[in-house]
Amino acid sequence: MFDDTPIERESMEFDVVIVGAGGAGLCAAIRLKQLEEETGKEISVVVVEKGSEVGAHILSGAVLDPRALDELLPDWRDDEACPIDTPVTSEKFLYLGQSGSMPLPNAFLPKSLKNHGCYAVSMANTCRWLAEKAEAMGVEIYPMMAASRLVRSDDGRVRGVIVGEVGIGRDGNPKDSYEPGMELLGKYTLLAEGVRGSLSKQVIQEFALDRDSDVQKYGIGLKELWKVPDENFKKGFVQHTFGWPLTDDVGGGSWMYHFGDNYVSIGLVVHLGYKNPWIAPYQEFQRFKTHPEIEIGRASCRER
């Protein structure tokens, strides 16, 4: 690991440093700039993103509840550039058997599984749109800037992050090709890295932020994005399932969203607590796509 010898780095100072240009980080940046307008006090904000561009590491196709967006950007529906344009028009929640299915009545579902008033979206495109909004308000966004470590003061406070640090070996020691990167310092540092972010894990462990939390559940998700012909496209249709091809002792479920210009986002999530060593999530996903509830879409996709 690194010794205690100080490393000289260039640095830049901001009021707020945000790590991660996903939905949370970008919305936070926009809100800070709104506060700047409301108070008349300048707030400098920088967002660093490890992907080659905003959206490059956003894999989710999602059903978006617009309530928070309504509060943040009340006029978003009037923006012709906004990619959030597919309201949920119909939905199913199914239990799958090998060759059939059983719908669960909507009245029996918890509110979190009801999608009326929501939108089927590409989160990658949504984040790109949010980034344009943020930059127009004066937020600085730096893609291809992975934050590798926190910058700490002598008393342990977080002062910012180190970005652009390369040439670190697997043992944690610098190699001959080591480049120290630079420091982005802020009065406040916001970690919006998403699930299992490397800096977030450090902070969670150090400050025991998960002390009163339930044990984390892990799963692997497999996703495909299809382009289907008009006869197989139901814009605004959302479907979630559980059951086949997973067995009773393997948790998980699936989604299918019809959105945009004849796009279908489809995927399967398999909880990683399964005990059968022969379970192969990718192969289960291939089996899942043969089910009658989605097979017609698969065939159409193949024809394209």
What are the functions of these language-model segments?
Residues 21-22, 50, 123:
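Glycine-rich Rossmann-fold phosphate-binding loop(s) that bind the pyrophosphate
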